[in-house]
Curated annotation (Swiss-Prot):
Annotated catalytic residues: Y197
Top-level enzyme category: oxidoreductase
Protein encoded by which gene: OYE1
Protein name in the entry: NADPH dehydrogenase 1
CDD domains, per database record: OYE_like_FMN
Function: Flavin-dependent enoate reductase that catalyzes the chemo- and stereoslective hydrogenation of electron-poor alkenes. The enzyme is reduced by NADPH, and oxygen, quinones, and alpha,beta-unsaturated aldehydes and ketones can act as electron acceptors to complete catalytic turnover. The physiological oxidant remains elusive.
Record carries keyword Membrane: no
Length: 400
């Protein structure tokens, strides 16, 4: 391991990134947010947060007081899942471990929001079949890719277009998952409606070919996401709910900028959120994946969509906005983005490799390189063994 080469850090301590901001009921002391980072360390069976390492992992990254952490995506129910080593928030056994994590983050005087996750067609159909569960999506006549279609057929678990009753059941499970999270001590929840997972599959005209009230128009495609928003606001309060969107994302076979109506689709969602805000139910934040990163599996600078911007959201939605996507190596871009006083910045991959990232951003210190090979590996290595800047100096990284 070593510092990133060919990168000139810039101190950002004099920017709005280091001005306090209130998100929901939380008084953040800076605006560098840890976005959801799937790490595949949960225990199987049971999708239980890792008993040996998870508390340490989150504690390390909560070390700067006043930091907002959004957890790795957590499945709201067994049916929502399909990955053995991602955590859930439906069982007592899971919540025991989450409570330890939440307490550890709060002991560092930081804040924690749980990302609520439903996979849809991105799930492994064979895992679902093994557990007697459906392989769900918005439609059953268009597939994520040929490989997923073949896997589903081989597992005798063909892609299933959700019925209206099944949509209602998912909404109930979202509510229960949100209640479980808050009861265990979380500060709030983020609804994952981005990156090609189930709610995004309903938003996108490529994956949603329905002809009922959940498809066929901008309003109908947004219905499921907005019903989840309304149900959670009712259940736990608007100030404890945020929403993640990725208008230009192409991960998991979404349309991104290739869809001519994509801005109209997301402008409608933003408008509906602002309408609710004006009625006294403003969400804590909207979280946007930037077109700078259309696919999280690509290296920094690859797959950038240059034909559009998320700036349109600001003219509609008047609450806080978290922007995530390839910012760590571009402090000059961050300096511009945070001139807007409603903006927070999500730092993902470099929060994995730099547990003290906030200090480094403030002072303009070198950044630890990350090791992509350990992102999803069931090991403590690459999870809880990245050094702080001071530790890296003791290891002689500045001489490498």
């Amino acid at each position: 391991m070593s510092f990133v080469k060919d990168f000139k850090p810039q101190a950002l301590g004099d920017t709005n990134l280091f001005k306090p901001i209130k998100i929901g009921n939380n008084e953040l002391l800076h605006r560098a947010v840890i976005p959801p980072l799937t790490r595949m360390r949960a225990l199987h069976p049971g999708n239980i947060p890792n008993r040996d390492w998870a508390v340490e992992y989150y504690t390390q990254r909560a070390q700067r007081p006043g930091t907002m952490i959004i957890t790795e995506g957590a499945f709201i129910s067994p049916q929502a899942g399909g990955y053995d080593n991602a955590p859930g928030v439906w069982s007592e056994e899971q919540m025991v471990e989450w409570t330890k994590i939440f307490n550890a983050i709060h002991e560092k005087k930081s804040f924690v929001w749980v990302q609520l996750w439903v996979l849809g067609w991105a799930a492994f159909p064979d895992n679902l079949a093994r557990d007697g569960l459906r392989y769900d999506s918005a439609s059953d006549n268009v597939f994520m890719d040929a490989e997923q279609e073949a896997k589903a057929k081989k597992a005798n678990n063909p892609q299933h277009s959700l019925t209206k009753d099944e949509i209602k059941q998912y909404i109930k499970e979202y509510v229960q998952a949100a209640k479980n999270s808050i009861a265990a001590g979380a500060d709030g929840v983020e609804i994952h409606s981005a990156n090609g997972y189930l709610l995004n599959q309903f938003l996108d005209p490529h994956s949603n070919t329905r002809t009922d009230e959940y498809g066929g128009s901008i309003e109908n495609r947004a219905r499921f996401t907005l019903e989840v928003v309304d149900a959670l606001v009712e259940a736990i309060g608007h100030e404890k709910v945020g929403l993640r969107l990725s208008p230009y994302g192409v991960f998991n076979s979404m349309s991104g900028g290739a869809e001519t109506g994509i801005v109209a689709q997301y402008a409608y969602v933003a408008g509906e959120l602002e309408k609710r805000a004006k009625a006294g139910k403003r969400l804590a934040f909207v979280h946007l994946v930037e077109p700078r990163v259309t696919n999280p599996f690509l290296t920094e600078g690859e797959g950038e969509y240059e034909g559009g911007s998320n700036d349109f959201v600001y003219s509609i939605w008047k609450g806080p906005v978290i922007r995530a996507g390839n910012f760590a190596l571009h402090p000059e871009v961050v300096r511009e983005e945070v001139k807007d006083k409603r903006t927070l910045i999500g730092y993902g991959r470099f929060f994995i490799s730099n547990p003290d990232l906030v200090d480094r951003l403030e002072k303009g210190l070198p950044l630890n390189k990350y090791d992509r090979d350990t992102f999803y590996q069931m090991s403590a290595h690459g999870y809880i063994d990245y050094p702080t800047y001071e530790e890296a100096l003791k290891l002689g990284w500045d001489k490498k």
